[in-house]
Amino acid sequence: MILYVPKSFSISAPISDIHLQSVLETKNTFHNNNEKLGYILGLSFGNYVNQTFEKQKKIGIELDRNSLLKGIQDAISGNLKLSHQDISSGLKELEKKLKHATKIQLKKNAKENFIQGELYMKNFSKLKGVKKTSSGLLYLLERAGEGEALKDETKITVHYKGTLINGLEFDNSYKRGRPVSLRLKDVILGWKEGLKYIKKGGKIKLVIPPNLAYGTEEVNGIPANSTLIFDIELLDVVNGV
């Protein structure tokens, strides 16, 4: 929940993210190290609260900051203005509101992602050498490669880079320093179709519409209805394994 420190909260949260209006450089601000460490923990928690408020604001929920600070003070002092039952029901109400608002925002984002993806594909399709398949996949063949044609059971080894249409990179085997080995049947539809246009040693750019990628689901940080761009290099092919 939002009103207590979650498991993901870290006392080492990046203080540099806090928007400080000023930094006082007075000496002897703290009487001892425990005071200093307590202050640092407070800054880190405050940073987490600020980030949480900003995220909630984006989905249309704005809680009162002063009330939150009073709640923190009362929790520390033990002087609560609400019963435990009221607190419990309030947390459930807040959780329900957050889930509802998040659901609405995700639908809105998914619709916008789809529209922007179609626009990107329309522009990309006009580039020299780009071809479009009947399924809607766009591809640009950079190097055909040689050898056997790929089948669904083919085991392949590839290097690849995946980006969103805004240029955000979400995966890159080159940066990890090792290629990926898998079977063609286990990849997303856009890969399965697009990789059959190259052979061992080939290289291709795929622009994959949502229905050939992850569709309306958000997967590993990839937003729903995202059009995906992949640069793929086919390093090795093993058929009949």
Swiss-Prot record:
Which family does the similarity line name? Answer: Belongs to the FKBP-type PPIase family.
Quote any Pfam family the record assigns: FKBP_N
Q: Does the keyword Cell inner membrane apply?
A: no
**What one GO molecular function would you report for this record?**
peptidyl-prolyl cis-trans isomerase activity
Show the catalytic activity: [protein]-peptidylproline (omega=180) = [protein]-peptidylproline (omega=0)
Q: InterPro entries, from UniProt?
A: PPIase_dom_sf (IPR046357), PPIase_FKBP_dom (IPR001179), PPIase_FKBP_N (IPR000774), PPIase_FKBP_N_sf (IPR036944)
| Keyword Isomerase among UniProt keywords | yes
Question: Entry's Gene3D superfamilies?
Answer: 3.10.50.40, Peptidyl-prolyl cis-trans isomerase, FKBP-type, N-terminal domain (1.10.287.460)
This chain's function reads: PPIases accelerate the folding of proteins. It catalyzes the cis-trans isomerization of proline imidic peptide bonds in oligopeptides.
Which keywords does the record carry? Isomerase, Rotamase
Enzyme nomenclature, EC number: 5.2.1.8
Q: What's the protein name? A: FKBP-type peptidyl-prolyl cis-trans isomerase FkpA
Where in the numbering of this chain does the PPIase FKBP-type domain appear?
153-241
What processes does the entry annotate via GO biological process terms?
protein folding
